Amino acid sequence: MEIILSHKICLDPTYKQAEYFRQACGIARFTWNWALEEWKRQYDLGLKPKALELKKQFNALKPIDFPWMYEVTKYASQQPFIHLQTAFNRFFQGLGAYPRFNKKGHHDSFYIGNDHIKLDSKHIKLPKLGWVRMREALRFSGKVISATISSQANKWFVSLHVKLDQMPKSCESTAKRGC
């Protein structure tokens, strides 16, 4: 049985690292808003937009129109397309509301894939940034499959998604509520 758990850990970034986080969140927000606007435009023309097609169009524009995006991890400008596709799938299935534009400071976050993450006790290594101090060590042993960096009340957090082979003993009694 495959189990995936998340562990949200408070980060202790330097000023430079926090600036990087703000920039990556801004790029993720900009990309989402660009993709949503383009989706609406194409849909109004009678087309059936797809996230991968929009991503290809965006990547063709990026070197010329948005070169500043290369200053942070590539995931900041890739993952919003996947999230938008999921949001529209949920909308068309009647499971969610129509996707809306993102505003600065409202659920700021960005995703990082496991191929760009390294952990060392109370530190996480992020692409184009280096080692960032975590306030606690990861509680679960397993394969880290992704991370999401987010901001809440002027604090930065990393939510690590870990694939486990079995449920940790500390979680067995609270499995219904989550660990």
Where are the predicted features?
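Nucleic-acid substrate recognition interfaces
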Residues: M1-C179
